[in-house]
């Protein structure tokens, strides 16, 4: 039987960047990976209601060759992440510095169209299901909003005890195109969980935004060399030979 792979992992290095942008020696990879997991877990707990879409972690060297961790948060609610007079942000930076024992740089990037972000759409559906909303209506509304915001296609799938049924099942909706086999297609994918009184529901969301032709990942980017300029001089027409002229006159 054919199995579906993650559309995000399949496109890493083609039209999507890595969420962890750092290199390390072989002996340090495991420790740094565990550190990344702790950072992501803490951020997801503190900003559970802040509509966090993506967390990108970079490791750079600061002054005096000190290790620094640069964290970029993509969110639809930057005001909630930063807090009043950056109080929440400073608190998070302090706690993360205590966890990692390193200097933390926290940047916040606003997601201007949350309807086109699969992670935010999946989290929104999960919150509505926990509030006992209709699973059919929630999916249809999410797809309509995505298409209205400019998506070329959207697909949703909810699995579990839908409506409190004793037998679990899956039900989903799709509209437009969602080409999972086209690698240049910009397909955003996310998974979320909804904890209801009847059990746990799984939510999957696919959003197709169009094809990407000119964007290259960082690993394959090359410096563009300036084109060579050639000074082309106009070529003067050669005068006809006397013999050619005389032959034409004879004809």
Swiss-Prot record:
Residues 39-112 form the KH type-2 domain. The keyword Phosphoprotein does not apply. Pfam families: KH_2 (PF07650), Ribosomal_S3_C (PF00189). Keywords: Ribonucleoprotein, Ribosomal protein, RNA-binding, rRNA-binding. It comes from the Bacteria. GO terms for biological process: translation. GO terms for molecular function: mRNA binding; rRNA binding; structural constituent of ribosome. The keyword Transmembrane does not apply. GO terms for cellular component: cytosolic small ribosomal subunit. Gene3D superfamilies: 3.30.300.20, Ribosomal protein S3, C-terminal domain (3.30.1140.32). Signal peptide: none annotated. Residues 240-251 have a biased composition (Basic and acidic residues). InterPro entries: KH_dom (IPR004087), KH_dom-like_a/b (IPR015946), KH_dom_type_2 (IPR004044), KH_sf_prok-type (IPR009019), Ribosomal_S3_C_sf (IPR036419), Ribosomal_uS3_bac-typ (IPR005704), Ribosomal_uS3_C (IPR001351), Ribosomal_uS3_CS (IPR018280). Transmembrane segments: none annotated. Residues 222-251 are annotated as: Disordered. Coiled coil: none annotated. Belongs to the universal ribosomal protein uS3 family. Part of the 30S ribosomal subunit. Forms a tight complex with proteins S10 and S14. Binds the lower part of the 30S subunit head. Binds mRNA in the 70S ribosome, positioning it for translation. This is Small ribosomal subunit protein uS3. It comes from Anaeroplasma abactoclasticum. The lineage of its organism: Bacteria, Bacillati, Mycoplasmatota, Mollicutes, Anaeroplasmatales. The gene is rpsC.
